[in-house]
Amino acid sequence: MGEETLRIAGRRSKLAVIQSESVKEIVQREFPNYTCTVLAKQTLGDQVQSKPLYAFGGKALWTKELEDLLYEEDLDQRIDMIVHSLKDMPTQLPEGFELGAITKRVDPSDCLVMAAGSPYKTLGDLPNGSVVGTSSIRRSAQLRRRYPHLVFASVRGNIQTRLKKLDDPENECKCIILATAGLVRLGLESRITQRFDSTIMLHAVGQGALGIETRTGDERLQAILAKVADRNSTICCLAERSLMRTLEGGCSVPIGVYSTFDEETSMLTLDGLVVSVDGADAAEATVSYKIKSDKEDAIACGQLLAAKLLEAGAKKILDAIHLPEA
């Protein structure tokens, strides 16, 4: 078989490039006849750093500029796939685009990062009125519920920028909350002060996994993506995305999840939480679901949990959230 070229694109941040390169390595290992190139492109979410994430409404914030390249008329500029942090991918993709594969998940938890030299080890240790930096209302809403003595402020920028801001003596934040996976992929695991297990915080839908977006029905890529995809992570993440899609929440709505799939018993367990922005109200539920058909049953599991959460009061919470227009 002759040599073929595959064009992989992602965002321009250091973390995004590492993620794109990781997919390139898998493809070239499994398909030595392919030469892969990586394109790094800026998106709207990268360009506008002055607004908190919820102010954008959460739709296509990190994706549109890249999606345009999948159908670029100039074939020399056209790409074949986009590597996203799955948590940043809208659960409803535009017509002509599909989620082609989900990679093996890195630790999906959120974590606490204290400023350099801080004597504090947990959020409970912090004095009253301490400022915690996070750009996610899912994180701040859950933490407000557990730690009412703390104050929360929006912190934007890539991970290195956020860490630099945190360590600046003039900075008001005592700590920041980040996705564990990002620090692990960047080799910055030593900055993690505490990983939050599911008793402290439920993570974002799809967190820790990479989602690969392609043109709908691109048969050439299907055999390639089958080697990139991870079954366990795919089942869990499809269920999580189904939950969010059913609740009609963008990535800025405070929905937390935790999922596990037991490959021996084929049982998928999915926990979900919808919490009000101020942390005062919450709806929680759990479902266990026997997986016989991976995609269909994972989606059904998410829909079932959504129905349980709505019964538990999630609709009232979601209806009360009026996010600013972009």
Curated annotation (Swiss-Prot):
GO terms for molecular function: hydroxymethylbilane synthase activity. This is Porphobilinogen deaminase. One of its GO terms (cellular component) is cytoplasm. Its EC number is 2.5.1.61. Belongs to the HMBS family. Its cofactor is dipyrromethane. It comes from the Eukaryota. The gene is HEM3. The porphobilinogen subunits are added to the dipyrromethan group. The modification S-(dipyrrolylmethanemethyl)cysteine is found at C251. Tetrapolymerization of the monopyrrole PBG into the hydroxymethylbilane pre-uroporphyrinogen in several discrete steps. Keywords: Heme biosynthesis, Porphyrin biosynthesis, Transferase. Binds 1 dipyrromethane group covalently. It catalyses: 4 porphobilinogen + H2O = hydroxymethylbilane + 4 NH4(+). InterPro entries: HemC (IPR000860), Porphobilin_deaminase_cofac_BS (IPR022419), Porphobilin_deaminase_N (IPR022417), Porphobilinogen_deaminase_C (IPR022418), Porphobilinogen_deaminase_C_sf (IPR036803).
